[in-house]
Amino acid sequence: MRSGENNGRNIAFDLLRIIAAFSVVVLHVSGVFIEKSPVGSLDFRLSNFMNSISRFGVPIFVMISGAIFLSEEKKVTVKRLWSKNILRMFIVFGVWSFAYYVYQSIFWWKFDFWRHGIVRTITGCVYASDHFWFLFMIMGLYALVPFLRTWLHHAEKKELDYFVILFMIFQIGRTTLMILIDKSLVHKIFDLVKIVELSWYLGYFVLGYILMRYGVSRMVKYVLYGLVPVGIIMNYLISDYMSLQKGAYSPGIYDSFGIFTFIHSVALFVFFKDVFSKVKVSGRIEKWCVNLSLDTLGIYLMHIALLDYFESNGFIVGSIPHVPGILLLSIVCFVICGIVAAVLRRLPFVGKYLC
């Protein structure tokens, strides 16, 4: 048996990546079911609930990256960041954006490079799929790592607490208020202080490091755990109410910077860090977790294309009830993408640039 933290690798992070990747798949699968269900119907509400409990994926991914890249134990140089991490992400984006563009061209219109021209092709690749925003965001955070490490490694705990407070006020609080009350009023209030955009995902990135290094007190931990079910219920009820009021699906409260999604994400991160970092696992289980964790980027990149294929061929909404349908389709999508990612990742020379 081996410790959950072995050979410099924390199995808690591997498990979190797997769960976060699956939550992203559930999020997008349930979103398709929601779009095809009348607002206020039982199917709409069940699908919306599934959507509400699967919003923690991206914050978890970002906190894991922050905990790893900002750690004192990891050796990081500007050259290594750009030549290995950022360059790899850029190549991954280029490969998959072109693949999505060709896929969409073949299925939705006849692909003809000479007719489209290089400018239209490049533009089409850049905007081939909305979910590629994550790659640009993570590359931006990677670029800031050297500055963040210098600050964080010399900062006192009270300074880090101050940063978290600012993040919660100017990002979490602001976003939540903008969803619940008049946006223009919130803008006017927060615009008085010109640090409204202080954090964005940088807040989650730094928070991952802080939680990993310092943790939280027992009281804060139990408060977080206790608020998770309350937050999930409130998230769902607010979205359901706003959807009924607008007559259309209204998922605004589910934003990554909404207070309830924030609580859910932080509580999960803390729980896995505290529990699974110390758990004893067999070498076989550890190997399985590590390999599947390494496939999560490929799963994230591919699942939209597979989901689109399922939807266009009528596999999404049929006679199967929504909740079992969402779970079944999510599992199928996750497994297929995981298998393909595992194969691509093992290709000599080019595998690391594919997923």
Regions found by a protein language model. Give the residues of each.
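C-terminal "closing" transmembrane helix and its immediate cytosolic amphipathic cap
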Residues: 2-5, 273-293, 304-355
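Interfacial loop-to-helix transition and helix-capping segments at the boundaries
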Residues: 46-58, 122-137, 179-203, 236-267
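Hydrophobic alpha-helical segments with transmembrane-like composition
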Residues: 61, 70, 100-108, 112-183, ...
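Functionally critical transmembrane alpha-helices in membrane proteins and complexes, commonly lining
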Residues: 11-71, 89-97, 127
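Transmembrane alpha-helical segments and their boundary/interface "anchor" motifs
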Residues: 51-60, 72-105, 109-130, 141, ...
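Membrane-interface helix-boundary motifs at transmembrane edges
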Residues: 6-10, 73-84, 148-160, 211-223, ...
